[in-house]
């Protein structure tokens, strides 16, 4: 096929320049990208600062830097072309469309540099009109004036405050320098595979622990990295100044990274690596007791609990004990308290302390028997977070799997029927529970058995106690379908239960009658005053009252 035939049967790519330029307008017309690009241009030009001034009366924004200036205005307004040196091109990778954000941010734009200037509108660029290069009295680096700027002063000020936080050179707004707390030069940190990383609590004196979310900057400007960037909380979070040759911002606004999910994973690895180095150093310099107590939480969150496996001390934060009479839990309730003392491996090995895995009540029927024994035995529960190789794991017992033996002599029994629960009540002499070969006498009532359909529940009450109504909370939460605690119902049931226990304990009949009459409010019945009655109960409890 000859060349002419080939050309007639082939196509090449092309660009509709005017349409392309017109569509760029939709990307930049209301964006604060103009501010970010102006900052970057000033920094690349070697400026020592970038100054922004806004004339509210004229809606005019002036941007001035003292950098090297513009050698060729043509490159400034040519898409995908840059006037930067080859060295800057290689190190900065400018894309070549940033200045168009300036062009579309105002009705007209004036650019002055090295005693020359150009003035144009976005329509001039779209129509590819001739733009004259004229003399200017401005000799410094670069001054850009946006007449009738489409951004108001408030929006400009807010955006600059955000952009300046991590920027490399000073930024001035309306004559005042903006704070740059996250600037690389103002931070202590570590150079990592992802770039420069500052970790509060390690690289400064702030009392904070491991944080998995933080702030990310690319070439000094903030970028959003889904899965890592923090959108809440204060300033005290990790700060990452990414290696911009490795992580490319997404065009045209450069406010996020390409492949943010991978970037977030990389940042997580870098953060955890810094924490591991820090914790290894702390382990070497601190006592075992201080190390586990101070560093356990951070080690857990940073995935470094393997550093704890050979430390012969368990911290208080992983240890709990039954600190009060166990009951069915409602929201916020807990009968488990954190231990006030650490536990050493030596105490566990010697048998002075018994360790159990975390215990979850599952209405097995004897859960509260086990927990009441645990309260008496002062055993400690260890949270599930122990790594599998930790020395304590081999010493952990499972309270749910231990054989339970309940002993004692029944001295009296009856049935209780309340508004929320019912069951047999047994008054016990020498009520004892044996688990793991250790026996303890119980001095409080305990509910055993299940309230499920077809099952029975029994309340075991040690002889000698006078109030045991609280045991009903082991059988029911007394919470209705609206999650409301029915306290009055509980108190009524508890009083009735205590009355039954008193009778089983041998309360004289006259005292029982006196309580019944008192609770019925008979003292307020004026027609009963100065009268005597004979009260009789038959074998079925039927009452007969005769006036005397």
Label the model's feature ranges.
Residues 1-11, 58, 68, 72, ...:
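Charge-rich (often acidic), low-complexity intrinsically disordered regions concentrated
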Residues 1-11, 109-111, 127-173, 179-180:
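Flexible, glycine-/charge-rich segments associated with ATP-binding catalytic modules
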Residues 1-40, 44-47, 73-77, 251-262, ...:
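Bergerat-fold GHKL ATPase/HATPase_c domain
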Residues 48-55:
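A conserved short beta-strand within the histidine kinase catalytic ATPase domain
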Residues 55-61:
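Short beta-strand-loop-beta element adjacent to the nucleotide/active-site pocket used for signaling
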Residues 65:
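Conserved active-site aspartate in kinases
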Residues 68-129:
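Flexible ATP-lid and adjacent glycine-rich G1/G2 motifs of the Bergerat
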Residues 154-161, 166-275, 304-349, 358, ...:
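GHKL/Histidine-kinase-like ATPase module
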């Amino acid at each position: 096929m000859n060349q002419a035939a080939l050309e007639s049967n082939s196509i090449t790519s092309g660009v509709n320049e005017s349409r392309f330029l017109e569509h760029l307008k939709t990307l930049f017309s209301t964006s604060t990208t103009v501010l970010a690009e102006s900052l970057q241009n000033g920094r690349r030009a070697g400026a020592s600062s970038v100054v922004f001034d806004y004339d509210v009366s004229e809606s005019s924004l002036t941007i001035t830097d003292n950098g090297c200036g513009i050698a060729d205005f043509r490159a400034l307004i040519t898409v995908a072309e840059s006037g930067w040196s080859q060295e800057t091109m290689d190190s900065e990778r400018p894309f070549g469309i940033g200045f168009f954000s300036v062009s579309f941010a105002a009705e007209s734009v004036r650019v002055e540099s090295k005693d020359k200037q150009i003035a144009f509108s976005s329509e001039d660029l779209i129509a590819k009109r001739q733009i004259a290069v004229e003399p200017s009295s401005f000799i410094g680096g670069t001054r850009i004036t946006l007449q009738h700027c489409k951004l108001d002063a408030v929006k400009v000020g807010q955006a600059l405050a955000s952009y300046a936080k991590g920027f490399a050179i000073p930024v001035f707004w309306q004559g005042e320098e903006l704070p740059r707390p996250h600037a690389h030069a103002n931070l202590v940190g570590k150079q990592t595979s992802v770039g420069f990383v500052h970790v509060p609590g390690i690289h400064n004196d702030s009392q904070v622990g491991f944080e998995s979310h933080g702030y990310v900057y690319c070439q000094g400007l903030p970028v959003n990295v889904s899965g890592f960037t923090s959108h809440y909380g204060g300033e005290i979070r990790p700060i990452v100044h990414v290696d911009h040759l490795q992580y490319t911002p997404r065009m045209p606004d450069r406010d996020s990274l390409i492949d943010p999910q991978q970037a977030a994973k990389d940042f997580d690895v870098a953060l955890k690596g810094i924490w591991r180095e820090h914790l290894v150093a702390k382990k070497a310099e601190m006592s075992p007791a201080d190390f586990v107590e101070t560093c356990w939480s951070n080690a857990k969150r940073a995935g470094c609990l393997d550093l704890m496996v050979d430390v012969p001390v368990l911290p208080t934060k992983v240890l709990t004990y039954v600190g009060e009479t166990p009951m069915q839990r409602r929201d916020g309730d807990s009968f488990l308290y954190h231990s006030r003392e650490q536990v050493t491996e030596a105490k566990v090995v010697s048998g002075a302390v018994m360790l159990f895995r975390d215990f979850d009540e599952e209405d097995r029927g004897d859960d509260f028997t086990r927990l009441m024994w645990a309260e008496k035995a002062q055993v400690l529960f260890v949270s599930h977070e122990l790594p599998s190789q930790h020395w304590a794991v081999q010493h952990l017992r499972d309270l749910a799997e231990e054989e339970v033996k309940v002993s004692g002599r029944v001295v009296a029994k009856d049935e209780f029927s309340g508004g929320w629960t019912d069951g047999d009540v047994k008054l016990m002499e020498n009520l004892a529970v044996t688990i793991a070969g250790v026996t303890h006498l119980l001095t409080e009532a305990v509910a055993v058995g299940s309230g499920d359909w077809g099952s029975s529940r029994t309340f075991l009450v040690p002889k000698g106690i006078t109030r045991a109504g609280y045991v009903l909370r082991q059988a029911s939460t007394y919470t209705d379908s609206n999650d409301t605690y029915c306290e009055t119902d509980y108190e009524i049931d508890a009083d009735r239960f205590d009355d039954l226990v008193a009778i089983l304990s041998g309360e004289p009949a006259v005292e029982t009658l006196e309580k019944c009459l008192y609770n019925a409010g008979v003292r307020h019945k004026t027609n009963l005053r100065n009268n005597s009655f004979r009260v009789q109960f038959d074998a079925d409890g039927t009452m007969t009252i005769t006036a005397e």
